[in-house]
């Protein structure tokens, strides 16, 4: 471990921490925590359950920010103490351990600085992510399932919870479509630029001649809207259909029509939910998803947004892709919007999406979802 490098890193990170403390305004955060705790102590606080839960989420968020700053400050103090000891009595192992602490601090500050770019109205919310197999037949359906695994791994690696709302299995392999909820702070902000067409090139495991196959899958991402947010949708604007939930066949097929699909006639938006046990629960879930889509359209106030967030049939094909995943004849994942790329395809498929997500946020990418989904 080079002492000069350690001192440089410590100085840089101390300055960055000071900037973070100024931006977050520690005295104001502490005052906010005190106000919220006093509010929560009121006898009638829980009379309105939804309002109380919202305030408790705000309190948890303030506490988390203060704890994060305290942890970062502790890391800097530990590094400074280590430096003083090292200059009195050099110990390479001690310095190496302190450098690891600074590396973790750098990662934390990098993440915080990135989250400052997530300033959209719904960036802090959870995400609803839908995957649709596109052109490519069975390979495309297999590709859709691979993407489901990739996003699930990414979410779990970031401490987020994944719940399947709807899943339609492929005839031979993979899935035709799937909708998942990703619950976690800034889930929508991180994932929103994943919207678009994802292209796979590989030797097809479903081709007896081992030919190279190109397959496509479409991704759409919506924020998970708070239940208290409501939109009045006239019943005449909705077309509700039901069907049986279940897999490819056998004793586990649901013989009751519990799956629900809702079409919003004026916009053509469609949502489907199959995972709940009752038709009523699936209808409530589908309505929540539809409202999220309509709310985003209303917030953007652009008719073109309808094409960006179209329903559950996605045309994912040549010329529309935002990212290529090449398994053969070479290995590379490349984002066509940011030029971010890596040769470690397996790591990406195991959920290592942060370099691509970070690049899209830092470069202010406008995800071309309309091209992918129209």
From Swiss-Prot:
Transmembrane segments: none annotated. Keywords: Cytoplasm, Methylation, Protein biosynthesis. PROSITE patterns: RF_PROK_I (PS00745). Methylated by PrmC. Methylation increases the termination efficiency of RF2. Its main location: cytoplasm. SMART domains: PCRF (SM00937). The modification N5-methylglutamine is found at residue 251. GO terms for cellular component: cytoplasm. Pfam families: PCRF, RF-1. InterPro entries: PCRF, Pep_chain_release_fac_I, Pep_chain_release_fac_I_sf, PrfB. The keyword Ribosomal protein does not apply. GO terms for molecular function: translation release factor activity, codon specific. Peptide chain release factor 2 directs the termination of translation in response to the peptide chain termination codons UGA and UAA. PANTHER family: CLASS I PEPTIDE CHAIN RELEASE FACTOR (PTHR43116:SF3), PEPTIDE CHAIN RELEASE FACTOR 2 (PTHR43116). This is Peptide chain release factor 2. The gene is prfB.
């Amino acid at each position: 471990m080079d002492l000069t490098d350690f001192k440089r890193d410590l100085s840089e990170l101390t300055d960055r921490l000071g900037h973070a403390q100024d931006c977050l305004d520690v005295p104001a955060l502490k005052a906010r925590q005190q106000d919220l705790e006093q509010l929560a102590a009121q006898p009638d606080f829980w009379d309105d359950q939804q309002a109380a839960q919202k305030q408790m989420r705000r309190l948890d968020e303030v506490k988390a920010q203060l704890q994060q700053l305290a942890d970062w400050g502790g890391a800097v103090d530990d590094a400074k103490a280590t430096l003083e000891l090292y200059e009195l009595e050099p110990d390479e192992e001690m310095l190496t351990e302190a450098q690891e602490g600074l590396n973790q601090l750098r990662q934390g500050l990098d993440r915080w600085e990135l989250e400052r770019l997530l300033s959209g109205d719904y960036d802090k919310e959870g995400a609803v992510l839908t995957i649709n197999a596109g052109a490519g037949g069975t390979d495309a359906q297999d590709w859709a399932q691979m993407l489901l695994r990739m996003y699930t791994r990414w979410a779990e690696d970031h401490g987020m919870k994944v719940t399947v709302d709807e899943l339609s299995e492929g005839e031979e392999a993979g899935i035709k479509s799937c909708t998942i909820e990703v619950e976690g702070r800034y889930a929508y902000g991180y994932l929103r630029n994943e919207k678009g067409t994802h292209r796979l090139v590989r030797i097809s495991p479903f081709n007896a001649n081992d030919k190279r196959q190109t397959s496509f899958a479409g991704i759409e991402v919506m924020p998970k809207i708070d239940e208290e947010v409501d939109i009045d949708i006239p019943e005449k604007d909705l077309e509700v259909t039901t069907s049986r939930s279940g897999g490819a066949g056998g004793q586990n097929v649901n013989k009751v029509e519990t799956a629900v699909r809702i079409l919003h006639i004026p916009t053509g938006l469609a949502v489907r939910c199959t995972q709940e046990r009752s038709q009523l629960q699936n209808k409530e879930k589908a309505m929540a998803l539809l409202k999220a889509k309509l709310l985003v359209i209303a917030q953007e106030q652009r008719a073109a947004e309808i094409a960006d967030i179209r329903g559950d049939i996605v045309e994912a094909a040549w010329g529309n892709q935002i990212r290529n995943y090449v398994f053969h004849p070479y290995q590379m994942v490349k984002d066509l919007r940011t030029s971010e790329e890596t040769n470690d395809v397996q790591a990406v498929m195991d959920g290592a999406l942060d370099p691509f997500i970070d690049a899209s946020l830092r470069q202010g990418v406008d995800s071309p979802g309309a091209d992918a989904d129209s």
